[in-house]
């Protein structure tokens, strides 16, 4: 019998809690990640007031220096710890796949200086369209169409760009490059990025409409992902008849593998929280696992190195945390964590190699305190033990510590 009938995992994308032991092997603009500390530096630089997460025990997590503006709790309402990444990567897919039990020993490729000519030339030859070379670098999806959309409307050239994650994105105005044509180009790009030197996690079609100065991306986005290289705990759950619900980009990250119910993409963190709450309220969701990603921390503030915006985004989530808890049942477990760091005060614009926080809360808890420090995959091992399924590659359950 399950200890908890429902478990809800919420990933606050990029909310790291201090440099990992191997941070010296990961870099931002030539600077090692050894001094990165997403939550710590936001707390110092911008101030951080998150009373609801603090009440669970966020400020009690072991750190060399306590969070400046997040107090410790003498009697927290939950259990907390920090977790270390084993896998060789600090991207979204690697983090999430490890959280679900995999050890990624060959990281995906990222292209901070843009894609090599070999890739661009192949796409040009297949599509019969030129590629705007100036866009070939990590770029904000809205900024890239603002900057190059007018040129695309005149020339029909493709806008190919990337991000901090191992993705290749192609933006196309729907009136200039029909959506079906864009999809075919992206399918081809997927076929040539399945191995080194360009092993990518996703190819993303990014259609948009409108006029210069007023472009908007449409709902015709399509992701061409790769499935995890072996079963995750999501697959183990689905195979055992335990429903799995994906909120936000979780379905894309796992290419639908092990997902029985996709609740759709998030328009924003707030929209994602709305969707999570609707998921919690589903009459048929009496047992199972929900998995939510809230990406605004990372996409809107981490990469843009905006500590004040990041702080406000954390405040927004914390303010809505009581709503999530109010929709939980007594035999529900809430787990709040992250997938990597993205220190908005750090060098460069890339993710940072950090520990991730873990907050565990249930109405049924009679105890509280610290969970032994472990690794990302301990989350999936805990979920697996709770529902009586096998673990994946790695992970040690902390279920027995939750009382």
From Swiss-Prot:
Alphabetically sorted, this entry's keywords are: Cytoplasm, Isomerase, Manganese, Metal-binding
Q: What is its main location?
A: cytoplasm
* GO MF annotation terms: magnesium ion binding; manganese ion binding; phosphopentomutase activity
Q: Name one GO biological process term.
A: 5-phosphoribose 1-diphosphate biosynthetic process
Superkingdom of origin: Bacteria
- Name the chemical reaction catalysed here: 2-deoxy-alpha-D-ribose 1-phosphate = 2-deoxy-D-ribose 5-phosphate; alpha-D-ribose 1-phosphate = D-ribose 5-phosphate
Pfam families reported in the protein's UniProt record: Metalloenzyme (PF01676)
InterPro entries, per the entry = Alkaline_phosphatase_core_sf, DeoB, Metalloenzyme, Phosphopentomutase_DeoB_cap_sf
Q: Which GO terms describe its cellular component?
A: cytosol
Q: Where does Mn(2+) 1 bind?
A: 13, 339-340
**Cofactor binding description:** Binds 2 manganese ions.
Cofactor(s), by name:
Mn(2+)
The protein's annotated pathway = Carbohydrate degradation; 2-deoxy-D-ribose 1-phosphate degradation; D-glyceraldehyde 3-phosphate and acetaldehyde from 2-deoxy-alpha-D-ribose 1-phosphate: step 1/2
The protein's location, in the record's own words, is:
Cytoplasm
Q: What is its EC number?
A: 5.4.2.7
**Ligand binding (Mn(2+) 2):** 298, 303, 351
Q: Which family does it belong to?
A: Belongs to the phosphopentomutase family.
What biological function has been recorded for the protein in this entry? Isomerase that catalyzes the conversion of deoxy-ribose 1-phosphate (dRib-1-P) and ribose 1-phosphate (Rib-1-P) to deoxy-ribose 5-phosphate (dRib-5-P) and ribose 5-phosphate (Rib-5-P), respectively.
Write the protein's name: Phosphopentomutase
**Gene that this polypeptide is encoded by:** deoB
């Amino acid at each position: 019998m399950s200890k908890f009938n429902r478990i809800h995992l919420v990933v606050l994308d990029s909310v790291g809690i201090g440099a990992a032991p191997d941070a010296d092997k990961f870099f931002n603009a030539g600077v090692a990640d050894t001094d990165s500390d997403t939550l710590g530096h936001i707390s110092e630089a911008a101030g951080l007031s998150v009373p609801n997460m603090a009440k669970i025990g966020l400020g009690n997590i072991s750190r060399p220096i306590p969070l400046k503006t997040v107090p410790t709790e003498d009697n927290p309402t939950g259990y907390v710890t920090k977790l270390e990444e084993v896998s060789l990567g600090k991207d979204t897919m690697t983090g999430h796949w490890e959280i679900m039990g995999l050890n990624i020993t060959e990281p995906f490729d990222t292209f901070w200086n843009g894609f090599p000519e070999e890739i661009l030339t192949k796409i040009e030859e297949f599509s019969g369209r030129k590629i705007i070379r100036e866009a070939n670098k990590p770029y904000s999806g809205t900024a890239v169409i603002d900057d190059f959309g007018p040129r695309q409307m005149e020339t029909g050239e493709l806008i190919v760009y990337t991000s901090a994650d191992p993705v290749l994105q192609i933006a196309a105005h729907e009136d200039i490059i029909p959506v079906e044509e864009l999809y075919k180009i992206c399918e081809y790009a997927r076929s040539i990025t399945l191995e080194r030197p360009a092993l990518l996690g996703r190819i993303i079609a990014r259609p948009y409409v409108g006029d210069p100065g007023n472009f908007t991306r449409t709902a015709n986005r399509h992701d061409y992902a790769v499935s995890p290289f072996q079963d995750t705990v999501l697959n183990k759950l689905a195979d055992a008849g335990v429903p799995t619900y994906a909120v936000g980009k979780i379905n894309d990250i796992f290419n639908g593998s092990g997902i029985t119910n996709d609740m759709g993409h998030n328009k924003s963190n707030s929209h994602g929280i709305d969707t999570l709450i609707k998921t919690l309220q589903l009459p048929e969701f009496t047992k199972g696992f929900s998995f939510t990603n809230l990406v605004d921390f990372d996409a809107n503030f981490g990469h843009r190195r905006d500590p004040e915006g990041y702080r406000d985004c954390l405040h927004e989530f914390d303010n809505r945390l009581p709503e999530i808890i109010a929709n939980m049942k007594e035999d529900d477990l809430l787990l709040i964590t992250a997938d990597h760091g993205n220190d908005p005060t750090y060098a460069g614009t890339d993710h940072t190699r950090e520990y991730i926080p873990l907050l565990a809360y249930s109405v049924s808890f009679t105890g509280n305190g610290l969970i032994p420090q472990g690794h990302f995959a301990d989350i999936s091992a805990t979920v697996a033990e709770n529902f009586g399924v096998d673990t994946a590659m790695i992970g040690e359950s902390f279920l027995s510590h939750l009382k």
